[in-house]
Amino acid sequence: MARSKSSAGWLKEHFDDYYVNKAKQDGWRSRAIYKLQEIDEKDQLFSKGMTVIDLGAAPGGWSQWTTHQTGDEGRVFALDILPVEPFAGVTFIQGDFQEDDVYQSLLDALDGREVDLVMSDMAPNMTGNKGVDIPRAMYLVELCVDLADQVLKPNGDLLMKVFQGEGYDQLLKSLREKYQKVLTRKPKASRPRSKEIYLLARGKKA
């Protein structure tokens, strides 16, 4: 079957992508590493010994950067519906975050451990229909917020990929009630055509 023009265009963009090539040269698992690196360098997300949850972790770039920044005493709990090649310092759970049993598996792995940072690079499979895509994306965001409500320690932080659209303003309002400040970030490594931004909610209120 011939590839569609859109999929062929995506492949060309992918292989011509500066950050894809840079990730290969630098030994990182994905171009997404540079989004997190830029946010980290601006906002100092990490410190040694932190406990971090990485949602939408595959193929593992964000977890790689996190273990690099948190050191041998840090712990990363990563989750994705796709497999991730294991590496030191990361506990990986494969499954759909929307499923109750997978969510519970993550809580079981934490074993009561309080979390310093919840981060999510999750996104649904996009159809191109905003009326479908935005609600699906917002549902994942809401699940991530619920998890942070449950496991983040006081003054903990939440970093999430979001897509602006219906429900975005209400999300901001809700986060501002729960956290000391909420920042928006658009890393240079985000593809220009992408509507994604990242919300960084800092300092969970007790």
Swiss-Prot record:
Catalysis: reaction(s): uridine(2552) in 23S rRNA + S-adenosyl-L-methionine = 2'-O-methyluridine(2552) in 23S rRNA + S-adenosyl-L-homocysteine + H(+)
EC number: 2.1.1.166
Gene Ontology cellular component list: cytoplasm
Tagged with keyword Methyltransferase: yes
Key words, A-Z: Cytoplasm, Methyltransferase, rRNA processing, S-adenosyl-L-methionine, Transferase
One Pfam family cited in the UniProt record for this chain: FtsJ
Organism: Hydrogenovibrio crunogenus (strain DSM 25203 / XCL-2) (Thiomicrospira crunogena)
Localization terms from the record: Cytoplasm
GO molecular function: rRNA (uridine-2'-O-)-methyltransferase activity
Function per UniProt: Specifically methylates the uridine in position 2552 of 23S rRNA at the 2'-O position of the ribose in the fully assembled 50S ribosomal subunit.
InterPro entries, per the entry: RNA_methyltr_RlmE, RNA_MeTrfase_FtsJ_dom, rRNA-MeTfrase_E, SAM-dependent_MTases_sf
Family under the similarity heading: Belongs to the class I-like SAM-binding methyltransferase superfamily. RNA methyltransferase RlmE family.
Lineage, uppermost ranks: Bacteria, Pseudomonadati, Pseudomonadota, Gammaproteobacteria, Thiotrichales
Annotated positions binding S-adenosyl-L-methionine: G60, W62, D80, D96, D121
Active site: K161 (proton acceptor)
Protein name listed in UniProt: Ribosomal RNA large subunit methyltransferase E
Keyword Methyltransferase on entry: yes
CDD domains in the record: AdoMet_MTases (cd02440)
Top-tier EC class: transferase
